[in-house]
């Protein structure tokens, strides 16, 4: 039995009462929160280890509700100035094909280093390069070592609507030197591979790794494939996820919105999490709410690619579970939940011309308890409550940018940079303390970053991508 106690911190619990407890303690035993209290009212039990949190804020770990991890090695140049399908076919797919398993291992470690340093403890990795041999094994090995909580949502594509081919051909003409790649699979093959993946990895790493099926988008997956994913999630008591209405092409191809299309086939349910939802109207929001569908909003990515802004306030007003996802590392160019929270608040204030449209408290909820709800994991993570997993972060607000501070939620959302995250626990294990990562010691970090840079350059060269074009002011 291992015990750990965090003492004399300010707890932002995110429990149902949203209690904020000053000068408080949290007691952790075997990876779970077993007790908490205020020092003036109770005495913490003895512990094997005590972390002094004086001057710090203790929060549930941030939850990255939708992301693509490997793509972090494709950032830094080739993605800029491209909209979604241009980016997909001229950068993402060729770049993924040019990656080797050793590159994937480096990408996952780099991603986790940046994520943990910004307070992210859970990631929903939509793995769209899992089709390539060795990539899954490379990723899982690093995830197990690093200690993050991971949903490995294995994506699949089992059809492509022929009407989009002319559009793709035109986009390819912009980068003719880049090879056109296909990640299509036969439906039966995708089913077998995802089933085997779940059998091997779901529940491993002390329960930190989960496996979901992830049909990519409605125009690229058969109804058979989506029905199978829905049944798989139900039978194995997991969730399933897909990208929805990230562009307006989905509606053009279906002659109705993707939400309407899925409802026609009975595919909207409480185990489904949909990402993006940019091209949504009130009917689409109503359909998702009616079926208790969960949502992940990638606000920075949608802006980066010029896609638009999802109607998040309308979803929040209905009480829907909406989490925040940083999306691909190369269509956000950072893995910083605090930065994405700030952008979420600002873009909706601007679009709605309403300075109170999403409160800082709600934004913080979206990064914690609502993110957990969007993953169907709110019974285990997302708040500081007895019985839940000890995924906790300590923020030190004694920085110039967070001084002065009075309103904690507003300070975290609008003033913080991310470097205020001092200590991170996942399952009660300390994976970062004093900003030192357990899985990337300081003496190894520079050499590792140089290796990541070298591998990224080699990937772009193999894919014939131009990463540093001529200076362009217009």
From Swiss-Prot:
Gene behind the chain: triA
SUPFAM superfamilies attached to this UniProt entry: Composite domain of metallo-dependent hydrolases, Metallo-dependent hydrolases
GO cellular component annotations of the record: cytoplasm
Activity modulation: Melamine catalysis is highly inhibited in the presence of aminoatrazine.
Keywords (A to Z) from UniProt: Cytoplasm, Hydrolase, Iron, Metal-binding
UniProt-listed InterPro entries: Amidohydro-rel, Metal-dep_hydrolase_composite, Metal_Hydrolase, MTA/SAH_deaminase
EC annotation from Swiss-Prot or TrEMBL: 3.5.4.45
Variant or mutagenesis effect after changing residue 331 to S: 6.3-fold decrease in catalytic efficiency with melamine. 24.3-fold increase in specificity towards atrazine. High atrazine dechlorinase activity and loss of melamine deaminase activity
Location in or out of the cell: Cytoplasm
Site feature: Major determinant of melamine specificity: 84, 328, 331
Protein name: Melamine deaminase
Ribosomal protein listed as a keyword: no
GO molecular function: ammeline aminohydrolase activity; metal ion binding
Residues annotated for Fe cation binding in this entry: 66, 68, 276, 327
Species classification: Bacteria, Pseudomonadati, Pseudomonadota, Betaproteobacteria, Burkholderiales
Similarity-based family: Belongs to the metallo-dependent hydrolases superfamily. ATZ/TRZ family.
Leftover remarks: TriA and atrazine chlorohydrolase (AtzA) from Pseudomonas sp. strain ADP are 98% identical but catalyze distinct biochemical reactions. Enzymes differ by only 9 amino acids. These 9 amino acid differences between TriA and AtzA represent a short evolutionary pathway connecting enzymes catalyzing physiologically relevant deamination and dehalogenation reactions, respectively. Potential evolutionary trajectories between AtzA and TriA have been constructed, and catalytic activities of the intermediates along those trajectories have been characterized.
């Amino acid at each position: 039995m291992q015990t750990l106690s965090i003492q004399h911190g300010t707890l932002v619990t995110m429990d149902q009462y949203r209690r904020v407890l000053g000068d408080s303690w949290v007691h952790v035993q075997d990876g779970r929160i077993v007790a908490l209290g205020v020092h003036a009212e109770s005495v913490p039990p003895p512990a094997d280890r005590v972390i002094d949190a004086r001057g710090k804020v203790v929060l549930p770990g941030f939850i990255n509700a939708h992301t693509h991890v490997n793509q972090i090695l494709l950032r830094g140049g080739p993605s800029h100035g491209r909209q979604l399908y241009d980016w997909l076919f001229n950068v993402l797919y060729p770049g993924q094909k040019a990656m080797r398993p050793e590159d994937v291992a480096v990408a996952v470690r780099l991603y986790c280093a940046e994520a943990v340093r910004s307070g992210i403890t859970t990631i929903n990795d939509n793995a769209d390069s899992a089709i390539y041999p060795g990539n899954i094994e490379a990723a899982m090995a690093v995830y197990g070592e690093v200690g993050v909580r991971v949903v490995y949502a294995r994506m699949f594509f089992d059809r492509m609507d022929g009407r989009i081919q002319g559009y793709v051909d035109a986009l390819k003409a912009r980068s003719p030197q880049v090879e056109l790649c296909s990640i299509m699979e036969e439906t039966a093959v995708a089913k077998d591979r995802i089933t085997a993946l779940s059998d091997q990895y779901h529940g491993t790493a002390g329960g930190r790794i989960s496996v979901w099926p992830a049909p990519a988008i409605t125009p690229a997956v058969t109804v058979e494939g989506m029905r199978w994913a829905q049944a798989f999630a139900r039978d194995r008591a997991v969730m399933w996820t897909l990208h929805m209405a990230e562009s307006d092409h989905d509606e053009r191809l279906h002659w109705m919105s993707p939400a309407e299309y899925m409802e026609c086939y009975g595919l909207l349910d409480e185990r489904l999490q949909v990402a993006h939802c940019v091209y949504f109207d009130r009917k689409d929001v109503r359909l998702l709410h009616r079926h208790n569908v969960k949502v992940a909003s990638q606000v920075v990515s949608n802006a980066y690619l010029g896609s638009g802004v999802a109607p998040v306030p309308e979803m929040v007003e209905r009480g829907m579970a909406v989490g925040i996802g940083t999306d691909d590392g190369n269509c956000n160019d950072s893995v910083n939940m605090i930065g994405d929270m700030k952008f979420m608040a600002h873009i909706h204030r601007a679009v709605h011309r309403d300075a109170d449209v999403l409160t800082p408290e709600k934004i913080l909820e979206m990064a914690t308890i609502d993110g957990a709800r969007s993953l169907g994991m709110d019974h285990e993570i997302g708040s500081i409550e007895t019985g839940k997993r000890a995924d906790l972060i300590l923020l030190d607000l004694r920085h110039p940018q967070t001084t002065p501070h009075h309103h904690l939620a507003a300070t975290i959302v609008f003033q913080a940079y991310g470097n205020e995250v001092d200590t991170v626990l996942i399952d009660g294990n300390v994976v970062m303390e004093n900003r030192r990562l357990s899985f990337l010691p300081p003496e190894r970090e520079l050499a590792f970053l140089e290796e990541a840079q070298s591998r990224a350059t080699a990937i772009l060269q193999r894919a014939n991508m131009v990463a540093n074009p001529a200076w362009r002011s217009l």
